[in-house]
């Protein structure tokens, strides 16, 4: 009888679950791409599922007896779920929902200070004690100490360090004036030497008088003179330059052509 009653309760539970699913309607499955979800309520539900899965895995990773490989797998899975949760939170904000990033709890380190950057790969629970992971935390602690010391040094620096108050005692003004006078004298001397060199170069490269008229030698020109009586009754001598005729030009070209042919073939 007890067995039959147990079977009846199980069948009743299955029937009730089936009726609830029929009344609720089909449930959308979580898509791989958050852009495919266009319903705000579905996006909220998917985020809750991811948070629930991440919480379970973070609870499981606290057990150091799981072994190195299992802890590394769980830590990878938690990082993947956190990255996926951030993507769904961004999608919820795009659909007009709650901005979870704005109201999220701030992450604190072991001392209680707020961490500057929450991005990157993280280690949870017993995964922090894995081989090679502890050394990473020690290096990060050393870097934080160096940054803190540098911040302390910069905090104590005042205007005297940058030289803004050096002129208040009046010691630098006479020294600066003396150096300024020496520099001015040196610059004036260099300028005078350069000007003298430019003038010397300009005088050496000056061209001759371009307006000087040179007399032409007319001995090589064939001319003809004629005497005429001017208006005042005085005789004037007129020199005519004989221009070559067409025949003279042809003979000259022919002679030049002969010379070129003779030079070409005789050489």
UniProtKB/Swiss-Prot annotation:
Localization, UniProt: Nucleus
Protein name, per record: Protein isy-1
Family: Belongs to the ISY1 family.
Designated gene of the protein: isy-1
Superkingdom in the source lineage: Eukaryota
GO annotations of cellular component type: catalytic step 2 spliceosome; nucleus; post-mRNA release spliceosomal complex; post-spliceosomal complex; Prp19 complex
Impact upon substituting residue 180 to K: In dma50; up-regulates expression of the transcription factor zip-10 and its downstream target asp-17
InterPro entries found in the cross-reference section: Helix_hairpin_bin_sf, Isy1, Isy1_sf
Function: Regulates the processing of the mir-60 microRNA (miRNA), which in turn negatively regulates the expression of the transcription factor zip-10. Does not affect the splicing of zip-10.
Segments of this protein annotated with the region Disordered: 195-221
Coiled coil (UniProt feature): 175-204
Tissue-by-tissue expression: Ubiquitously expressed.
SUPFAM superfamilies, per database record: ISY1 domain-like
Entry's Gene Ontology BP terms: generation of catalytic spliceosome for second transesterification step; mRNA 3'-splice site recognition; regulation of primary miRNA processing
